[in-house]
């Protein structure tokens, strides 16, 4: 099993933590990661685009002129697509762009991105992130002590609200629970800051 250094909130190395090689030590599958990221980005699309077809455009209920005898081309409605102000043909309608990939694929993608972060030395383990109250300055001190000055995703255990509240005003810092962090969240960050309890949660979820 791979070992990573374990720090406290002051940036002092206190021990090491063993990582499960089946989760944090596999050969990253870039193709699977790509597929999952595309899927998750597609799910974020609003899909609220819409146009009016000939049935939705106001007016046009009356035939503009009689069928025969005028010498003009026959028309049934002034809201037909060929008319100015008419309806749109085959335009976009509201829809969901989301689609689901198999659970095995999603799990492999998570293992791949975690393994990549560990291999690239972009995985920082911290004993805990506990705050007496939500304080942005206190969280900033922790990041400074750990020499983290790039875009970071902080993974905490369920129920650690003060950590999330303390970090939300900091630029380039995102907080998620270990059980709900997505592949897109992880690949979007330069580094991962993970609590010891969150590591255990990740290993439980992906075991």
From Swiss-Prot:
One of the primary rRNA binding proteins, this protein initially binds near the 5'-end of the 23S rRNA. It is important during the early stages of 50S assembly. It makes multiple contacts with different domains of the 23S rRNA in the assembled 50S subunit and ribosome. Forms part of the polypeptide exit tunnel. GO terms for molecular function: rRNA binding; structural constituent of ribosome. GO terms for biological process: translation. It comes from Streptococcus equi subsp. zooepidemicus (strain MGCS10565). This is Large ribosomal subunit protein uL4. Keywords: Ribonucleoprotein, Ribosomal protein, RNA-binding, rRNA-binding. It holds the Pfam family Ribosomal_L4. The gene is rplD. The keyword rRNA-binding applies. Belongs to the universal ribosomal protein uL4 family. Residues 49-78 are annotated as: Disordered. SUPFAM superfamilies: Ribosomal protein L4. Part of the 50S ribosomal subunit. GO terms for cellular component: ribonucleoprotein complex; ribosome. The keyword Cytoplasm does not apply. It comes from the Bacteria.
